Amino acid sequence: MSKKHHHKHDHFEIIHKDCGYGVHAKVSVVKRESDGKLLIWKQPVSSNPEHQKAFREEIKRSKYWRKFGISHVKVCWYSDKHSLLKTYIKGKTLTQILKDDSQFFSKTKSRSLKALGKFLRLLIDSRHYIQNLSCKNLVFDGKKWHVIDSSNVHDRESRSRTRREYKRKFFETWSKRLHSNNEIHYLKSFLEKYCR
């Protein structure tokens, strides 16, 4: 990595500056000086108060993710009280996995697919529906899947409603990344097995 990508900022070194952009934030990967741990630094894209509101909501959502065991990501205010620091999860997103392996859902014995099934059951059993849980917001660290970002979280009265919503949403979202009817068939089988 060339030195032009390294910048000092208070107690961490910026490794990848502005490597991602969203509605509310630009994202950098940073290394904490005290222990060398990688973190995500989210800075607001402007001074609009809506960005701070979105950051407060993200902190709340991360507590929910940890409470139900669907992520180890912690989110907190940085010392400037305007930007966030988040746990960096090393691994591949579901988007990257599906791009690299179009046969992913047919490999029923793979560790990552079994872990994804277990992850789905945790989501359903929580009786909460996480909006906008896209492929790019799910990361596999080699052992388990983590939510790294999402929209709102909604309480659901019944497990069956939660199951139906996830099953429909995941099929709708994930099937767009598949290239054959055969793979779509395997996705349906996977969702039938784990979204019960």
Predicted region positions:
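A conserved alpha-helical element in kinase catalytic cores
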Residues: K42-C76, R111, Y166
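C-lobe/activation-segment region of protein kinase-like
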Residues: H128-Y129, D141-R196
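Protein kinase catalytic-loop region centered on the HRD/HxD motif
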Residues: F119-H128
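Conserved structural core of kinase catalytic domains
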Residues: H72-S112
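Hydrophobic residue at the +6 position relative to the catalytic HRD Asp in the kinase catalytic loop
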Residues: L133-F140
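ATP-binding glycine-rich loop module of kinase domains
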Residues: E13-E58
